[in-house]
């Protein structure tokens, strides 16, 4: 209803005159149009792509880059077949459906979709037209299929190559736990997607992508072409607190390595798979320095696995209170989006709760 109100007021997708509004979805749709026109590599030319955006949304709207690998031209080209507004709605509806399905598969509770919809970062992702729902769907589905259907899990994680910063930890965890079929499927699907994108759009995008990615990383992580409050990683928090690029990078690297090491230890131990899945999904959001508010929509996945374990094995009142507090923290993060990167703190607190449960085991609540 809130999004409908934004749309009717001319502040979402289209302005009051029916012209497109610049959102994070705009570069995806325009990149898809470039790919359909036969020159996908042009999307990595920041000057050319900026001119296209200016022509599409006007000179005063600003510009967004196209930082995704060439495999992401595949879905971009599909949505670009639709008119802009319909493409926006179709993309959000399809990826949200995947996210809701993944959440339901984890908890098997009819209230799960409602909880995901109630999460404030779901509204943020839908408003800006981003791909946080897709990231959540792939991680959630991949982990939920891992034990019984490892090939399907590998397919999900192979598709996550579109945002490889969230994939970094999973192959290592799969190797540690002996999920070799899932690991092989992940690599195979990634390779097949690369081949498919090359056949569809040529090899030129693969040549243009590395320098474009370097340029974007330099702009986002060093030059600061955006407010540090939008970067929800430990690195973003350190920069927001006044640290320079090098010391912030060191702080992030130390915490990322610590979290990765703990996740590996959790996956080496015998114990609840739900706790292991929660640890992996949570750690994936912490180890990358490149994490924006809309990416935090994926926090529902570690939360769902943790809640499932609390339901099945019991938990203390403190654990239940902590979960509720973290959920409230997401609202605080939503209110402070772009000002203070509270997402880093929420992620670290959630992982701490998961790790505590992994190493100490469940402690049932006292009987009432």
Where on the chain are the PLM-derived regions?
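Membrane-interface alpha helices of multi-pass inner-membrane proteins
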Residues: 151-164, 168-175, 280-287, 327-331
């Amino acid at each position: 209803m809130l999004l409908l109100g934004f749309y009717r007021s001319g502040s979402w997708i289209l302005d009051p005159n029916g012209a497109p509004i610049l959102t994070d979805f705009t570069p995806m749709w325009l990149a898809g149009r470039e790919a359909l026109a036969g020159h996908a590599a042009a999307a990595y030319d920041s000057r050319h792509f900026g001119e296209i955006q200016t022509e599409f949304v006007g000179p005063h709207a600003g510009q967004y880059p196209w930082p995704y690998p060439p495999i992401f031209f595949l879905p971009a080209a599909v949505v670009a077949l639709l008119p802009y507004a319909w493409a926006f709605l179709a993309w959000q509806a399809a990826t949200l459906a995947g996210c809701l399905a993944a959440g339901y598969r984890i908890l098997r509770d009819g209230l799960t979709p409602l909880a995901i919809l109630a999460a404030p970062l779901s509204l943020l992702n839908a408003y800006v037209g981003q791909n946080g729902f897709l990231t959540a769907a792939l991680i959630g589905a991949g982990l939920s299929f891992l034990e019984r259907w490892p090939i399907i899990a590998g397919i999900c994680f192979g598709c996550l190559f579109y945002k490889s910063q969230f994939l970094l930890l999973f192959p290592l965890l799969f190797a540690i736990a002996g999920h070799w079929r899932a690991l092989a499927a992940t690599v195979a699907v990634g390779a097949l997607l690369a081949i498919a994108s090359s056949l569809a759009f040529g090899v030129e995008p693969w040549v243009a992508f590395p320098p474009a990615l370097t340029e974007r990383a330099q702009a986002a992580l060093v030059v600061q072409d955006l407010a540090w409050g939008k970067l929800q990683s430990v690195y973003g928090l350190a920069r927001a607190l006044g640290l320079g690029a090098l010391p912030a990078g060191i702080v992030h690297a130390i915490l990322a390595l610590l979290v990765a090491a703990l996740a590996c230890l959790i996956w080496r131990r015998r114990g609840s798979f739900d706790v292991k899945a929660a640890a992996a999904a949570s750690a994936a959001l912490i180890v990358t320095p490149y994490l924006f508010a809309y990416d935090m929509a994926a926090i529902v996945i570690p939360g769902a696995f943790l809640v499932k374990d609390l339901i099945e094995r019991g938990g203390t009142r403190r654990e239940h209170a902590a979960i509720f507090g973290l959920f409230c923290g997401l609202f605080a993060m939503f209110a402070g989006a772009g000002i203070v990167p509270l997402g880093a703190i929420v992620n670290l607190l959630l992982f701490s709760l998961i790790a505590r449960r992994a190493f100490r085991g469940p402690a049932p609540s006292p009987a009432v």
